[in-house]
Amino acid sequence: TNQFTQKTMEALQAAQRLAIEYSNQALEQEHMLVALTQQQDGLIPQLLTKMNVDPGTFEAAAAEKVSQLPHVTGSGRDPDKVYISNELDQALTAAEKQAQQMKDEYISVEHVFMGMLQRPGRVAGELFKQFGITPEKFMQVLSAVRGNQRVTTDNPESTYDALKKYGQDLVEAARANKLDPVIGRDSEIRNVIRILSRKRKN
């Protein structure tokens, strides 16, 4: 695998915009942590919450670290060019290994976060320590959310919670007596059955 999921690409782009906005020459782990935590419907805020870490507080702390990075301005610098720092590069390499280990076909946001946990730069390391985030804790909450599903598409987040959400929505709808008759929805139902049987096979 060397393909990133949509959310990983979005986070990399957001991190790059952040670095440009702050006139930072290098894309650091801190930028990436802010970008990953900012993904509203993303997996990382959800996993942080499950580790009893408030995503907003974590994001603010990471953003504070970004604001302390050296600003590079002046004629010699192309404002739109940002290179990946050594530390982030190592974390992305670790993320790729993590994806392979987990037999995933794409590098997803959880692999990137895990990569930073395994190869933290000094500043990211301080953040993880401050919030009590460890690789073990992270893997624990990740497997609770992901179950034994593998990342086989570039948009895996849509499936992780789909079943839980779908089940929940049906229960709530039944309570509120809002369930539609099932006529004409066979394609939808087939879809759910396919997802369920795939889950069993895994």
Name every feature range the model reports, one short phrase each.
Residues T1-N202:
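Histone-fold recognition with a strong bias for associated Lys/Arg-rich disordered tails
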